[in-house]
């Protein structure tokens, strides 16, 4: 699958998402500018690009294990296919210290995920029980 990426600032030296290995689930994403997060602060960190996701997929910026060990974690709000703005990493500093994140830091991993688009209905037109374990009789 090919997904179009648009640089937010043309000609800027923005690092675009890149996989370290061909079969990695996520592509590393990088901070555009240096950031300093206060203790327990959550902030949107711009990544310098937007995506043109096809229908039927979403994306999330997952935490990197190395950043998590330092007390910086990415939250996981979905990036829907109709969102065309700049992609951000939503990062929380879980520590009691200021955390500096230099520009160009690998802050997370962009993962594209296929989704099911259900129709939510009140009735399916079939009888279903609300019992669970041993609901069909003795073993």
Predicted regions, residues:
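DUTPase catalytic domain/fold
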Residues: 1-139
């Amino acid at each position: 699958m090919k997904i179009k990426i648009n640089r937010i600032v043309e000609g800027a030296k923005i690092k675009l998402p890149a996989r370290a290995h061909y079969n990695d689930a996520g592509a590393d994403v990088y901070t555009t500018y240096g950031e300093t997060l206060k203790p327990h602060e959550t902030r949107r960190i711009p990544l310098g690009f937007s995506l043109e996701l096809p229908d039927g997929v979403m994306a999330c910026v997952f935490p990197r294990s190395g950043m998590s060990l330092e007390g910086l974690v990415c939250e996981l709000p979905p990036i829907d296919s109709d969102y065309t703005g700049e992609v951000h990493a939503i990062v929380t500093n879980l520590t009691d210290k200021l955390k500096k994140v230099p520009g160009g830091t690998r802050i997370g991993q962009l993962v594209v995920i296929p989704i099911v688009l259900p129709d939510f209905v009140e009735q399916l037109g079939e009888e279903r029980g609300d019992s669970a374990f041993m609901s069909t009789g003795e073993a």
